[in-house]
């Protein structure tokens, strides 16, 4: 039998604890094509996720709201997911292979209020956004155009300090993530 605490949030209780206890490399991103290697420390991951959580809340997203996340293998994927956890926003991560139709299905099934995508998926979201009545916020990793918001700019506008009044603990029974499972013959379940 597991002893489950009343309040538990992986981003606060594991990530932030690790950042304070022993700040080491949390992620190493290697871009073979560009020949670059970028290390992200636990402290950076913790601080950026706190900034992003506050940015989501500043946009009006609340505990229990959903966000569709389609970001490739890059450090921001982790920052976004941990930020969603800290804000109580339910993340719905998706693979880079998702089509515009796949993204629309996920957004509509969950009533997602935000999409957070890498640049390569902006065109897909633009193609379906009018079909997604709950979608209110479009966030892109990198530079933003039109009514899209830049992840970097959103994070830069927020303080990284963790104030429990701003980012309160949530019950361990809260939904953290929705994972759509699918195969090649049917819609996701």
Give the label of every model feature segment.
Residues 1-11:
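Flexible, non-catalytic linker and terminal segments flanking ANL/adenylate-forming cores
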Residues 10, 39-40, 98, 170, ...:
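A broad, structural micro-motif
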Residues 23-25, 140-146, 159-187:
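Conserved pre-ATP/AMP-binding loop-to-beta segment of ANL
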Residues 26-82, 99-104, 152-156:
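Conserved AMP-binding/adenylate-forming core of the ANL superfamily
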Residues 58-59, 82, 86-153:
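Structural core segment of the AMP-binding/adenylate-forming
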Residues 65, 89, 173-174:
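Surface-exposed loop/turn positions
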Residues 67, 84, 115, 175, ...:
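Conserved S/T- and glycine-rich ATP-binding loop of Class I adenylate-forming
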